[in-house]
Every structure is written in C-alpha cells, then in structure tokens.
Amino acid sequence: MQPNEISQQASAHRIDRPIPLRERVRQSMQELIISRQLAPGQHLVESELAEMLGVSRQPIREALQLLNSEGWVELHPGYGAFVHSPTVTEVDELLAVRSALESESARLAAERVDADGIAHLRKLCADGQAALERDDIDSMVNANAEIHRYITELSGNRVLLDFVSQVDRRVRWYYTPIARSRGQHSWQEHARLVDALEAVDADAASRIMREHTEHTRQIYLDEHAEDGDQTEQPAKPRTRRRRTVRTSAS
C-alpha cells in the first residue's frame, strides 16, 4: 500500500477530538453574558462561577482568559475579572455594520428563497410573536436572531454569512435589554420583510431590512442617550442557578 493511500484511508476514519472543557466553559459563560444573567460590569468570582457551572476553578480561569481576548471580559490585576461594559460608541458602530450587511443579505435572499424558506420564516415570526405575548425575553431574542441568521443563510453568500455570524452574538447581547421596547413593532417589521421576500422584491426586502435594523440601533441609542460615551450601566443580575457543563463530547 502506498503512503498516500494510507493517508487517505486514515483521514476517512479520523476520530474527532472532544471539545476541551475550557472551551465548553467559555461557551456557557458567553451565553450567560449574552442573556444578561452575568450583567455588564459584574464582578466574576472564580469560585462562584465554578460552583454555578459544576467545574473546578482551573477551566474557569482558562475560559476567562479566552473571553478577555475576545472582548467579553475585562481582567484587572489586583481586582479580578469583570463582564465588559460596552460603550454607546462601540454598540453604535457594530449595529451600523450589521445594518449594512443584513440589508445585502435580504436583497440576495429575495432572489433565492423558495416556498419552504418562506414557511420557515413565517414559523419563526409566529414563535417570536408568541414569545412577545408571554413576555419571554430569551425566546424573543433567540427567535429574532434565528430570523436574521436564516435570511443571511438564504442569501447563499458564504462570506456574508461568515461576517454576519461574527457579529451575531454581540447583536444578541445588545438586543436583549431593548427586546421589550422593540416589542410589537419589531415583529410587524419582520412580517413585512417576509412579505417582500415572498414577493421576490429584492429592493423592498433590502430597504425594509435596513429600516428594521436602523430602528433597533436607534432604540438602543435613545435608551442610552444619557450615558454619552460612558459604559453601559450594570444591570441587576438575575438570580443565579447551577448550570452543568457536559464533560462528554457533543
């Protein structure tokens, strides 16, 4: 058997490595930050996080280093780790980029979407509306994020999808405190957007998406107008509950 044949056979049977514990801890902590269960400015105590997630302090420490490198956490020598508090300027800049990217996503999606895609978008809208009616912020934020992600997927542009995916978690983080304020208007705008996609009206879809994302951006800026370029004020954290990080590969 030739060496290249061995290499090809070996790659076909390669065993996937399990995700390191520190990475699973990082993912769990990132979601706690995005959902505001760990609030901006909150002091992150290693022992408390370890107890909450059911792990030792070592993967917590490693996860904090990773989150610091990604801008989710700030490490202050002698004081400890804190959830990053975003400034109004950084939120404004990211949401402006999001508006430009997703308006193009909508334009391209209108030219490619089929009946199944429209049906899925209608279901996501219904899920979001139901979450709004029962005041379920987490489900509302998730449905909103999934609508935007799916429209970008429908665009068929992999580079665009990659860029949008990079800002998606930040968008969810910024959207969570204003989801209730956006409320009914947001889901009405989503419905209009889906109508434009179904009508294969690329220009209308792009315009509605831009208006929709700009409304979200403006609501955030209006609600934080008094902050100027100061960091977002820490919100009162939710009651913490123990979360278990799986130790097996998933």
Residue ranges of predicted features:
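Short linear motifs at protein or domain termini
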Residues: 1-111, 218-250
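C-terminal regulatory/effector modules of DNA-binding transcriptional regulators
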Residues: 180-250
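Residue-level recognition of short, well-ordered coil/turn positions
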Residues: 37, 72, 136, 201-202
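Conserved amphipathic alpha-helical segments that form helical-bundle/coiled-coil interaction surfaces
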Residues: 94, 98, 115-177, 187-196, ...
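Residues at helix-coil transition
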Residues: 34-35, 156, 198-199
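Short helix-capping and inter-helix turn/linker motifs at the boundaries of alpha-helical repeat units
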Residues: 20, 118-119, 181-184
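Mobile beta-alpha loop/short-helix "lid" or hinge segments that flank ligand
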Residues: 68-74, 169, 182-184
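Hydrophobic residues in alpha-helical segments
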Residues: 33, 109, 132-133, 197
